[in-house]
């Protein structure tokens, strides 16, 4: 059964401006520790951050908490499976929260020119 859905759109230029203004400190506010190495190696750091931010916003909307405890920016990470499909990873507290409620999340990400869109679905297992 569907617990919730969430979507978010991010203008990459907005992220690029913040990144230029605040540097790595801005990225550290958005990224979980596990995402930071991939961000540093990214060919387009602003696009990378925009995707992560949109994915986390969509997750919070689908969960119904917004980007707040337990679904903070650092508690939610975006990764990819062996085929490149995006997926969520969680900090211990959020993983426990989801397990206790038997919730499972799915993520779709797309980007085109100036925008990134994320769509999240959370279902009951």
Curated annotation (Swiss-Prot):
Q: Which SUPFAM superfamilies match?
A: 4'-phosphopantetheinyl transferase
Pfam families this protein is in? Answer: ACPS
Q: Which UniProt keywords apply?
A: Cytoplasm, Fatty acid biosynthesis, Fatty acid metabolism, Lipid biosynthesis, Lipid metabolism, Magnesium, Metal-binding, Transferase
Q: What class of enzyme is it?
A: transferase
Q: What is its EC number?
A: 2.7.8.7
Task: State the reactions this protein catalyses.
Answer: apo-[ACP] + CoA = holo-[ACP] + adenosine 3',5'-bisphosphate + H(+)
Among the GO biological process terms of this entry, one is: fatty acid biosynthetic process
The cellular location(s) given in this protein's UniProt record come to: Cytoplasm
Instruction: Kindly list the GO molecular function terms attached to this UniProt entry.
Output: holo-[acyl-carrier-protein] synthase activity; magnesium ion binding
Co-factor(s): Mg(2+)
Q: Name one GO cellular component term.
A: cytoplasm
| Residues annotated for Mg(2+) binding in this entry | 8, 57
Q: What is its main location?
A: cytoplasm
Q: Does the record carry Lipoprotein as a key word?
A: no
Q: Which family does it belong to?
A: Belongs to the P-Pant transferase superfamily. AcpS family.
The task this protein performs is described as: Transfers the 4'-phosphopantetheine moiety from coenzyme A to a Ser of acyl-carrier-protein.
Name-wise, this protein is: Holo-[acyl-carrier-protein] synthase
Gene for this chain: acpS
């Amino acid at each position: 059964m569907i617990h919730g859905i969430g979507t978010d759109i991010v203008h990459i230029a907005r992220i690029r401006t913040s990144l230029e203004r605040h540097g790595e400190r801005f990225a550290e506010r958005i990224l979980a520790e596990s995402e930071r190495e991939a961000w540093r190696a990214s060919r387009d750091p602003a696009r990378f951050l925009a995707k992560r931010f949109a994915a986390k916003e969509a997750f919070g909307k689908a969960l119904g908490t917004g980007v707040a405890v337990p679904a903070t920016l650092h508690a939610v990470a975006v990764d990819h499976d062996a085929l490149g499909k995006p997926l969520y990873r969680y900090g211990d507290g959020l993983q426990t929260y989801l397990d206790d409620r038997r919730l499972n999340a799915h993520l779709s990400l797309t980007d085109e020119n100036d925008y990134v869109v994320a769509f999240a679905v959370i279902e009951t297992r």
